Amino acid sequence: MTSELVGFLQRNGHLIGRFAPIPCGFLRKARAVLVVVAPGQGAQSPGFLTPWLDVPGVAERLEWLSLVSGVDLIEHGTRSDADTIRDTAVAQPLIVGAGLVTLLSLFPHPSGAYASISAGAGHSVGEITAAVGAGVMTAEQAMVFVRERGRAMAHAAAVTKTGMSAVLGGDPDEVVAAAREVGLTPANMNGSGQIVVAGTIEQLASFVAPDGARVRALEVAGAFHTEHMAPATTILGKIGNAITTHDPRIRLISNKDGQVVHDGREVIRRLVQQVSQPVRWDLCMQTMLDLGVTAMIEIPPAGTLTGLAKRAMPGVETLALKTPDDLPAAWKLIEKHGVHSVIDSTPTWRLVIAPAKGTF
């Protein structure tokens, strides 16, 4: 029998109880752990919502969210061209709205989601979708917030001509050092050998990728998740203060540092701050691994995050929910990996107060 460390509690010199650490082996047995993730800007493509309109209730929900946001989600999700949906003020509400309606198709009853999902996360604007899924704020609050986020970031991007480039491969430390040498910000640390750098057009032009790395310019409106977005942070801070929140009902993993956030107000604060701070998706994936995640479902417009996970999280079963045809496979994955409260939220010690039977 293995020995056990036991601590004793005293009050006024009298022994009142003891506590014993629970061996980690009892808490971390092999089990199924499901995470649902929401993609960010750039994942959208023309017509990606078209097949979803055949799902009962989706069109009506999209119409409602369109009214709330002032953006025609059905038009932009089914008929608008690539240039139109690349516009930040269009893309952001479209991505969040699409994620919200497809989440309801995946989990028609929210209680079913909370009983199945162990953790949630979103990349950049996808964090807003994840916050709604976790119960932090309502869909309507999210659509107003993301509408103003898109507008504010578009206005901030218009001040100075800026952009972003993806750096693929190479040593991450060398890529970051080379970027900072010319004044660029490593705006997205995506893991799996992908770093997105951002800054002025002149800075991007002067960037020289280290050996083994290649650079691909991104078609975005500006240097998101950098100091160039500071004006947007100021605007969103005022809006965020007006949002009534609830604490997350699942583990919500933050882009800022990969930490699990348990306080609803803190979630909103981080959503405000993240527009001018780097996205640390690499740390989010590391947290998922630390939590023992065994499966990941990515909601529409899906594909980007599961692609990163396949390289950075080997052994984790992934599913990109692209069309309604993927729903049966997603439900099967939920049945296999969805277990209520399986991620450890209990402390690694237990307090026992005498006289409890068997204490002494």
Please identify what each model-predicted range represents:
Residues 1-10:
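Extreme N-terminal basic, low-complexity initiation segments
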Residues 26-174, 218, 295-325, 356:
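FabD-like malonyl-/acyl-CoA
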